[in-house]
């Protein structure tokens, strides 16, 4: 039992270690916001990132609905696309599944300003906004960062990112040819720029999870449960 879990007053009274009793709040508002723009349609291990994001979103929706929270789905590329209403209760999972099936591939650049501003205008209470997205560098992500700063003033924002294993491999591989050196340097630069954006997101108050694609759903569920237990929602 960790120290944070110990109820010291009750333990002293009863002469043994007793755990604190936590009341996990229900009725939180959870928004699953899926970027379906061009970058998210690139494959990771043979499957488009947006498909992996939808799978992770559905897993978290199932857990959140079962836990008594409200869940809604929102997707966007150059403009807002899918927008479900908020639902509650396990039987509503079918509706979330149906709306998730409408999330489609796009060759358009993502317009974060329009998408996140539209989403924020629809939220009439503090929410956990989970954004599944990707970005390349600080310049392309600049408009996203400006909008996120406004969103975090009222809401808890969590970014879900998939690790770019291909870039990491290119950056780490021992070069055998001159062109390998150029590829390695470029990959390393892109990874560093990505970390700059992640760092700025955190400075703005957003939470960020960068996970392997097969761990995206489980990592999200773990963080969601942690946030609930810490009464941060």
Spell out what each predicted region is:
Residues 1-91, 126-133, 139, 146-150, ...:
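An amphipathic, basic-hydrophobic helix/alpha-beta surface used to engage anionic
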Residues 76-79, 117, 217:
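A glycine-rich phosphate-binding loop feature that marks nucleotide/adenosyl-phosphate handling sites
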